[in-house]
């Protein structure tokens, strides 16, 4: 997760000096980014519990481990923001324009075999408290919790693979901020007072860039796997239903109106002119976007290698709705 965060921060920090921003471009850019991020959250919340065995067996079989992964959102979602803020993509990060911007995720995940019937239960949890990264070049917070129950249609034995179906629930919430990202104040061009058509200067002093997201997702999945000596390849498919995801981004800064803090009436006029999806206060300009409740579809698969009771899983996933990619690594102890 740390590597994916570093890539994202380097991407955001690749900025030069500039003086003025077109507000319409800023609004459109952040609105597009927030929409694409909210659309990609159900996919990101699926990180964890995608272990190679389609069924681990009944109790006392169990396992616990750590999963680290990332999913992508299309680069086009962020390119409008970069254009509006005068940010250029560094040449060493050109691969992002092709594969997308990585959004990291991690979980501690565990599975326990069921009693009497052939099922297993999984739980996962990931948490990065606000303030843990204080003093770094960025701030981040992260929370992911979820679980599932899988029922074995077939058990792995002889030439027969294991096949299971499962139902799960995931909730994800997080945010990232980059203080002092932009060099110097930003001017928002040509604010016109509708009362007298006079032009005024809006300026953001020492702005910081921030993003926030949350989603609640129900998931139905099926998986097939086959243990061959020390290896277990697997494939799966999932249909998820999002109850609605929310994502947003913007700038936190002191807003100045002709060089002074705006009054309540001036803020009301500014919001009237630029409002809608944008929320403007004297401390921030942010855009929030909700994705409608709906279905999402993904395929996943990978391979695990085990020595005695230690397993290493390498997995990949593809989201059909957003064309996003995902990858994860899981290290666990399982009996």
Question: Which role does the model predict for each range below?
Answer:
Residues 20-148, 153-155:
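Transmembrane beta-barrel domains of Gram-negative outer membranes and organellar outer membranes
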Residues 68-72, 114, 125-131, 153, ...:
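Transmembrane beta-strands of outer-membrane beta-barrel pores
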Residues 62-66, 119-123, 147, 161-167, ...:
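Transmembrane beta-strands of outer-membrane beta-barrel proteins
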Residues 21, 291-335:
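Predominantly the C-terminal beta-signal and adjacent terminal strand-loop region
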Residues 12-19:
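Sec/Tat signal peptide C-region and signal peptidase I cleavage site
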Residues 60-62, 104-110, 143-149, 216-222, ...:
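Hydrophobic, lipid-facing positions within transmembrane beta-strands of outer-membrane proteins
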Residues 74-84, 88-101, 130-142, 170-218, ...:
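Extracellular/periplasm-exposed beta-strand and loop segments of Gram-negative cell-envelope proteins
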Residues 1-4, 155:
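Positively charged n-region of N-terminal signal peptides that target proteins for export
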């Amino acid at each position: 997760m740390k590597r994916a965060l570093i890539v994202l921060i380097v991407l955001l920090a690749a900025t030069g000096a500039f003086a003025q921003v077109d507000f319409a471009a800023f609004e459109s850019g952040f609105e597009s980014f927030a929409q694409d991020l909210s659309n990609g959250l159900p996919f990101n919340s699926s990180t964890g519990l995608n272990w190679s065995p389609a069924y681990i067996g009944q109790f006392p079989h169990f396992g616990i481990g750590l999963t680290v992964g990332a999913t992508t959102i299309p680069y086009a979602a962020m390119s409008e923001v970069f254009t509006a803020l005068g940010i250029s993509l560094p040449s060493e990060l050109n691969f992002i324009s092709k594969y997308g911007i990585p959004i990291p995720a991690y979980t501690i995940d565990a599975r326990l075999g069921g009693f009497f019937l052939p099922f297993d239960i999984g739980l996962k949890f990931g948490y990065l408290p606000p303030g843990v990264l204080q003093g770094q070049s960025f701030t981040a917070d992260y929370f992911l919790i979820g679980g599932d129950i899988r029922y074995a249609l077939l058990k792995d034995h002889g030439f027969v693979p294991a096949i299971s179906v499962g139902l799960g629930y995931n909730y994800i919430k997080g945010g990232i901020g980059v203080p002092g990202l932009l060099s110097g104040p930003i001017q928002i061009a040509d604010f016109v007072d509708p009362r007298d058509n006079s032009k005024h200067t809006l300026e953001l002093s020492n702005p910081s860039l921030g993003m926030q997201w949350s989603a609640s997702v129900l998931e139905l999945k099926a998986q097939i796997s086959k243990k061959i000596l020390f290896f277990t390849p697997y494939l799966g498919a999932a249909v998820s239903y999002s109850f609605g995801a929310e994502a947003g981004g913007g700038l936190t800064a002191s807003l100045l109106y002709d060089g002074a803090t705006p009054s309540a009436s001036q803020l009301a006029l500014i919001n009237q002119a630029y409002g809608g999806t944008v929320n403007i206060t004297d401390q921030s300009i942010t855009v929030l976007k909700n994705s409608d409740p709906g279905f999402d579809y993904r395929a996943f698969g990978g391979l695990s290698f085990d020595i005695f009771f230690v397993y290493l899983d390498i997995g990949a996933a593809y989201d059909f709705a957003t064309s996003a990619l995902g990858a994860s690594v899981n290290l666990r102890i399982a009996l």
